[in-house]
Amino acid sequence: MELRLYDTLTKEKRTFVPLDANNVRMYVCGPTVYDFAHIGNARPVIVFDVLFRLLRHLYGEAHVKYVRNITDVDDKINDRAARDFPGLPLNEAIREVTEQTGKQFHADVDALGALRPSVEPRATEHIGEMREIIERLVAGGFAYVAEDHVLFSPQAMNAANSTLPRYGALSNRSLDEMVAGARVDVAPYKKGSTDFVLWKPSKPGEPSWPSPAGIAAQGRPGWHIECSAMAWKHLGEYFDIHGGGIDLVFPHHENEVAQTCCAFHRERMANYWMHNGFLQVESEKMSKSLGNFITIHELLADWPGEVLRLNMLKTHYRSPIDWTMKSLEESAKTLDDWYRVAADVDPGRPAASVVEPLLDDLNTSLAIAALHGLRNSDVSALAGSLRLLGFLSESAAQWEDRKQKASGVDAGEVERLISERTAARGRKDFKESDRIRDQLAAMGVAIKDSKEGTTWEFSR
């Protein structure tokens, strides 16, 4: 069975044919490191990690290159640095914010079981590439200088008599309608309401670099040009897959396409565009004002990362996901069972019943349903399939030990209470037996009686 992926540009599933099967290339937009990543940010991390693993499974680990960037120059970073480190020069404060936040991001995504990308470029290390693309755009008549800004003109792109794509094609928008519907105040230096910034002057104390070809003031890049530059540097002018959250389709990805295609006279930037759906919490949009804004770091204090991973993958990546406590509890119970059954088993090849749904536009929901079927039929294939999806990163004993430490429950105390309960049952003191059972339940311990004795585990 061949791999088929839904392409946001063509609005259909397409058979995946790599440009070079020995060098499959994927770019995914990464974090802007100004704050801890929230659970919505975890979705593209997990989704495209599964795709990365699947591509490596199909083409070989040495033949897949995955690039996920880090945006470390941005207004949000500047604002956070000034607020959190008022006693430091702004550049030093920015360094503190980006280093601390970047370190936490890596700790969080490692805990989610995500493989590190092949390359993780930082925007500030690619200013030269950004300047070169901007110079190409100005020379080609697609960008212009105004009041020390350099701006891209979508109108100039669509007016070009060439093989360039139409601005708005990715997001299925009409440029004329965008212009007609513009309701925001347009900066006076812009020629058109849809023109966007490639380069802007920096305020005193902010990070700054010499402008492209000296055509404007010392300043810094706009957000969109950063990803065009990093993708070009590490994957070339045209590559296989570009991914991210659906919120990035417009304007970010639309503008990336415009910049890259106009700079290099290409019909396409990426052969396939993939976007994951939105996430809400307990049927409500996640927001700080509603008090349901949850960071990955906060969730990891209560749940193993693999529980968060499974909870995310139970829903198809393009569908909206409702993040609920009930679903988390169900995911935890499922993983407890998988660890008991398969963690210490030599993994076999991933089962076809799991791989085939993944080949159909990364249908993790059906793949997970197939895992349940393997549990009682082929534990070796179950173990191999779980590892393909990024699960079973530790032994069953390590999993239980970590759960115990997280619970704060003393295993010796549990064993003592179970012995007392066994003695109470032996003397038919069922009232005392029930009291101890309830005490254990309050500690988060579930017990199971059998002919061989009483066993226990942590419940969720």
UniProtKB/Swiss-Prot annotation:
It catalyses: tRNA(Cys) + L-cysteine + ATP = L-cysteinyl-tRNA(Cys) + AMP + diphosphate. PANTHER family: CYSTEINE--TRNA LIGASE, CYTOPLASMIC, CYSTEINYL-TRNA SYNTHETASE. This is Cysteine--tRNA ligase. Belongs to the class-I aminoacyl-tRNA synthetase family. The gene is cysS. GO terms for cellular component: cytoplasm; cytosol. GO terms for molecular function: ATP binding; cysteine-tRNA ligase activity; zinc ion binding. Its cofactor is Zn(2+). Its EC number is 6.1.1.16. Zn(2+) binds at residues 29, 227, 252, 256. ATP binds at residue 288. InterPro entries: Cys-tRNA-ligase, Cys-tRNA/MSH_ligase, CysS_C, Rossmann-like_a/b/a_fold, tRNA-synt_1_cat_dom, tRNAsynth_Ia_anticodon-bd. It comes from Bradyrhizobium diazoefficiens (strain JCM 10833 / BCRC 13528 / IAM 13628 / NBRC 14792 / USDA 110). HAMAP family: Cys_tRNA_synth. Pfam families: CysS_C, tRNA-synt_1e. The keyword Nucleus does not apply. Binds 1 zinc ion per subunit. Its main location: cytoplasm. Keywords: Aminoacyl-tRNA synthetase, ATP-binding, Cytoplasm, Ligase, Metal-binding, Nucleotide-binding, Protein biosynthesis, Zinc.
